[in-house]
């Protein structure tokens, strides 16, 4: 989960953070039967919810997520990937998928390197772009009321989606990039990743079907998912069968 303040920008309605929650609510339904964990990140990353198949508990965790959770600003995607990798452990009889939802702005320099290391551990990464390339101002609120974030020169800060970086991160870990502005395609893409985690790598591509979310599926949910699926270990099964023979 990217919880940096830029996720409050309103180039996605009603804002990036809320849009992500609505989209991820549907994803939770698709991923039932898998273990899901949650990492939140801004200037740093930490494990917010360990891997679990308790979806009610997961939603309770998500209900508490805000951009105020971040002590340091930034977009530490590399740190988030490393945190997720540690949560997965070193088991080789399971396939793992990582879904990162972020605007990709102000990213750390080691994100691609972290993705490459994750790929060597068999982790496939899908990135979801939250925002638009045109961007939007970042709203803030203090005791004096509503305002926009200003830079050092006193000018409003416009936050823009860094799509290119998110595409590179996905490519480094054999994954695909999707836009949160096209929620149905993104859902189908993640579902495809889960269904095919044990079938090889993926080509990075971008899709463009723009389909609205259904109101009855607008639940609070995840930005960054850890998906762990038990793989069918054919070689292992054959070995055990031969030993019994």
Locate each region found by the language model.
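Solvent-exposed loop/turn segments at secondary-structure junctions
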Residues: 5-6, 43-47, 104-107, 131-135, ...
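Membrane-embedded segments
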Residues: 1-96, 110-113
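Extended, hydrophilic extramembrane loops/domains of integral membrane proteins
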Residues: 166-196
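VWA/integrin I-like adhesion module and closely mimicked acidic/polar interface patches used
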Residues: 71-75, 97, 104-172
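Short, hinge-like loop/turn segments at secondary-structure boundaries
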Residues: 54-57, 143-146, 195-198
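Structural recognition of the beta-strand scaffold that forms the well-ordered cores
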Residues: 39, 100, 126-129, 178-179
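C-terminal signal-anchor/stop-transfer transmembrane helix together with its immediate cytosolic
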Residues: 196-245
């Amino acid at each position: 989960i990217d919880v940096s303040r830029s996720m409050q920008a309103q180039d996605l309605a009603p804002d990036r953070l809320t849009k992500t929650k609505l989209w991820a609510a549907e994803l939770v339904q698709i991923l039932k039967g898998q273990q899901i964990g949650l990492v939140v990140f801004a200037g740093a990353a930490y494990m917010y919810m360990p891997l679990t198949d308790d979806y009610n508990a997961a939603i309770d965790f998500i209900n508490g997520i805000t951009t105020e959770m971040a002590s340091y600003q930034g977009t530490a995607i590399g740190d988030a990937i490393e945190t997720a990798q540690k949560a997965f452990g070193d088991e080789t009889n399971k396939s793992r998928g990582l879904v990162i939802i972020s605007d990709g702005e102000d990213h750390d320099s080691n994100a691609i390197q972290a993705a490459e290391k994750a790929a060597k551990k068999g982790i496939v990464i899908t990135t979801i772009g939250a925002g638009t390339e045109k961007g939007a101002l970042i709203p803030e609120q203090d005791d004096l009321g509503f305002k926009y974030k200003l830079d050092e020169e006193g000018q409003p800060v416009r936050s823009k989606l860094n799509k290119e970086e998110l595409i590179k991160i996905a490519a480094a870990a054999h994954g695909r990039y999707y836009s949160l502005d096209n929620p149905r395609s993104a859902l189908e893409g993640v579902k495809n990743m889960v269904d095919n985690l044990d079938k090889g790598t993926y080509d990075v591509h971008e899709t463009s079907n723009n389909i609205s979310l259904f109101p009855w599926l607008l639940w609070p949910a995840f930005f960054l998912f850890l998906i762990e699926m038990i793989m069918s270990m054919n070689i292992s099964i054959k070995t055990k069968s031969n030993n019994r023979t």
